[in-house]
UniProtKB/Swiss-Prot annotation:
Optimum pH is 8. This is Sulfotransferase 6B1. Belongs to the sulfotransferase 1 family. One of its GO terms (molecular function) is sulfotransferase activity. Disulfide bonds: none annotated. Its EC number is 2.8.2.n2. It holds the Pfam family Sulfotransfer_1.
Length: 303
């Protein structure tokens, strides 16, 4: 993952900015999507268009709170198993976050580079597709995603909080949260589910069988690992192991990034009306699509 000190420094700086930021001041809008002003700038987005990807870059794409830090750890461990070199990115790994000069600095980083993003497919720099970088896309069911996002806002000190779960749910459904609508993100990425160099991973599948998931990721990236190596990485990458080490790897925010990781945690907060509204939105946006089928909505989201 990113160099520990760089990651922690960046997060600490973002949290410091958040202290004086209210919910009404939290967002900047770029090309119709809201982003957190504590992490993103218009200048960085404009500079991103000229980012030069490499063919051996690995891009990890996800909507917020769908497991991006988990996948980043897994891919870092896979690279270590192959190269015997600990992966350490000198920048905060989220591609669209940071200052506008970061992309010049990234030209000096050794390969392979691991990049993460919460952007829609069509908001990414064209060089990613031109140079055929590999893209891992991780999805999580929308109900657990919403609940995890709510707890992140309301549990982390200094981040603007919502008055209630009901208030957050209304904003989530409308797409008025950081990085916008879950469903717009899903619709956009669904168009590319069968693209070359793109692989979709389900958070719930990793929870059910981490060894199989890691093996699939390894094969997609073209790595040849033994079963023993896969087992070792799996042991180091369980949610409990990640949570136990979270303060060391991610600083004070670590325990909030790895809060529970449960499948079905949404049942503690969703009321019947909210269930119906989310079910209708899923049906309207994703029912019958390849991604909709992959999400196994009936298994994970119907009470």
């Amino acid at each position: 993952m990113a160099d520990k000190s760089k990651f922690i420094d960046y997060i600490d700086d973002a949290l410091e900015k958040s202290k004086e930021t209210t919910l009404s001041q939290l967002f900047l809008t770029y090309q119709g999507i809201p982003y957190p002003v504590t992490m993103c700038t218009q200048e960085t987005f404009r500079a991103l268009d000229a980012f030069e990807a490499r063919s051996d870059d690995v891009l990890l794409a996800s909507y917020p709170k769908c497991g991006s830090n988990w996948i980043l750890h897994i891919v870092s461990e896979l690279i270590f198993a192959v190269s015997k070199k600990k992966y350490a990115c000198p920048e905060f790994p989220v591609l669209e976050c940071g200052d506008a000069e970061k992309y010049q600095r990234m030209k000096l980083f050794p390969s392979p580079r691991i990049l993460t993003t919460h952007l829609h497919y069509d908001k990414l720099p064209q060089s990613i597709f031109k140079n055929k970088a590999k893209i891992l896309v991780i999805f999580r069911n929308p109900k657990d995603t919403a609940v995890s996002f709510f707890h992140f806002h309301n549990d982390v000190p200094d981040i603007p909080s919502y008055a209630s779960w009901d208030e957050f749910f209304r904003q989530f459904i409308k797409g008025q949260v950081s990085w916008g609508s879950y469903f717009d993100f899903a619709i956009n990425w669904n168009k590319h589910i069968d693209d070359e160099n793109v692989k979709f991973i389900l958070y719930e599948d990793l929870k059910e069988n981490l060894v199989v998931g890691i093996k699939q990721i390894s094969e997609f990236l073209g790595f040849s690992l033994t079963d023993e190596q896969i087992e070792t990485i799996s042991t180091q990458s369980t949610f409990l192991a990640m949570r136990a080490n979270s303060q060391e790897t991610h600083g004070a925010i670590g325990p909030f990034l790895f809060r529970k990781g449960e499948v079905g945690d949404w049942k503690r907060l969703f009321n019947e009306t909210q269930n119906q509204e989310m079910d209708e939105r899923f049906k309207e946006c994703l029912a019958g699509t390849s991604l909709g089928d992959k999400l196994k909505y009936e298994a994970y989201c119907l009470a």
